[in-house]
Amino acid sequence: MADVLDLHEAGGEDFAMDEDGDDSIHKLKEKAKKRKGRGFGADEGTKTRIREVYDSVEQDGDEPGPQRSVEGWILFVTGVHEEATEEDIHDKFGEFGEIKNIHLNLDRRTGFLKGYALVEYETYKEALAAMEGLNGQDLMGQPVSVDWGFVRGPPKGKRRSGRRRSRSPERRRR
C-alpha cells in the first residue's frame, strides 16, 4: 500500500495561498452587472418595444385591409392544380405586372404541389390588378382563389364589451 504524503506536514511551500486573490474576486463580482432571463433586458426598457410600421392601404369600414410585407405585396393563391409549374403561374400572373417572387410548396411524399402558391409584387397596384383579374379564373382547368397574403387586423377602437350570451334563467331571478 502506498504512503500518502501530506503536503502541510512535509513543509511544502510549493502551494502558497494568495490571500489578496479573494479581494480581487469580490471586486470583480461587485462590478459585474447582474443579468436575468431571456435577453437580459429586464431594466433596459423592454416594455417600450419599437414596432415596425409597414405600408398598408387605408379602407373605409370595419373590414381588415391588405398589408405590405417586408419585401412587397404578397398574394395567396389557393386551388392551384397539383401539376402546375412555376412557369404556368408566372405566365398567368405576369400579365398584371412584374413578379418579384413566386413560392410553391411541394408535397415531399408525392412531389406535387400542395395546392397553393405565394406570388409577390413590388407595387400595390400590380397586386390588386392580379387579384381582381384572376380571382375565380381557371388555371390548368381548375378555378383559383386569390387573396392577400397579409391583412391588417380589425380596428382596435371598436371592441365588444359586456356579456355575449344571455343570462341563464336562474341568474335572472336574483
UniProtKB/Swiss-Prot annotation:
GO annotation terms (biological process): mRNA splicing, via spliceosome; mRNA transport; nuclear-transcribed mRNA catabolic process, nonsense-mediated decay; regulation of alternative mRNA splicing, via spliceosome; regulation of translation; RNA splicing
InterPro entries: Nucleotide-bd_a/b_plait_sf, RBD_domain_sf, RNA-bd_8, RRM_dom, RRM_RBM8
UniProt KW keywords: Cytoplasm, mRNA processing, mRNA splicing, mRNA transport, Nonsense-mediated mRNA decay, Nucleus, RNA-binding, Spliceosome, Translation regulation, Transport
Segments of skewed composition (Basic and acidic residues): 1-11, 44-54
Parts of the chain that traverse the membrane: none
Primary localisation category: nucleus
Domain RRM: 73-151
Compartments, as annotated in UniProt: Nucleus; Nucleus speckle; Cytoplasm
Compositionally biased residues, Basic residues: 28-38, 155-174
GO cellular component, one term: nucleus
Gene3D superfamilies reported in the protein's UniProt record: 3.30.70.330
Described function: Required for pre-mRNA splicing as component of the spliceosome. Core component of the splicing-dependent multiprotein exon junction complex (EJC) deposited at splice junctions on mRNAs. The EJC is a dynamic structure consisting of core proteins and several peripheral nuclear and cytoplasmic associated factors that join the complex only transiently either during EJC assembly or during subsequent mRNA metabolism.
Family: Belongs to the RBM8A family.
Protein name (record): RNA-binding protein 8A-A
Gene designation per UniProt: rbm8a-a
